């Protein structure tokens, strides 16, 4: 087992089922319907919200423990979620996805990979803490606008202690 998988398994072993992202619930109407990719989707709360609202969702996470719990949660909720165990550095998808979501996770080095997977006219939703955890995992208020500069900003705001960004890829 690789070190990242072991670290995330340990985190999820101790975690109760989290609540869905409040900003995602608030702003999901601004996202493009169709196929959605939930990057580092963890226990599946974001995927379930999107699936129950009509998206065809694929969740990807490195943790075998998380993907097992996400599958079970989707089954309990009767949410149509395809769950894939994979490393975000080597996403096994061709795309395109009309929506890509990344909540409570940041990996700046995969921005180009996500842009390639995002469909023309598709939306990217990012939510990440500004403070409270290691600086490596926090973002600056407008960092997503810079990181995804090729996207047309639909929303770039701060909700409490979190930066929230929605960007649309040109059609």
Question: Can you name each region flagged by the protein language model?
Answer:
Residues 1-31:
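S-adenosyl-L-methionine
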Residues 34-42:
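Conserved class I S-adenosyl-L-methionine
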Residues 63-65:
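Conserved SAM/SAH-binding beta-strand->alpha-helix loop
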Residues 70-71:
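Conserved SAM-binding loop
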Residues 77-88:
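Conserved SAM-binding strand-loop segment of SAM-dependent methyltransferases
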Residues 92-99:
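A short acidic, Gly/Pro-enriched loop at the edge of an enzyme's catalytic core
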Residues 111-123:
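A short glycine-rich, Lys/Arg-flanked "PGG" loop and its adjoining helix->strand segment in the class I
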């Amino acid at each position: 087992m690789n070190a990242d998988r072991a670290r995330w398994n340990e985190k999820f072993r101790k975690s109760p089922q989290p609540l869905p992202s409040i900003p995602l619930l608030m702003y999901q109407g601004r996202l493009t319907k169709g196929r959605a990719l939930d990057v580092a989707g963890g226990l599946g709360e974001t995927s379930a919200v999107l699936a129950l609202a009509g998206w065809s969702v694929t969740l990807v996470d490195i943790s075998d423990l998380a993907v097992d719990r996400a599958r079970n949660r989707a089954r309990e909720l009767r949410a149509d979620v395809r769950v894939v165990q994979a490393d975000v550095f080597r996403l096994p998808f061709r795309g395109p996805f009309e929506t890509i979501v990344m909540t409570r996770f940041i990996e700046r080095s995969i921005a180009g990979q996500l842009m390639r997977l995002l469909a023309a006219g598709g939306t990217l939703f990012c939510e990440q803490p500004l403070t409270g955890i290691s600086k490596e995992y926090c973002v600056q208020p407008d960092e997503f606008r810079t990181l995804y500069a090729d996207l047309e900003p639909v929303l770039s705001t701060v909700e409490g202690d979190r930066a929230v960004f929605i960007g649309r890829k040109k059609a």
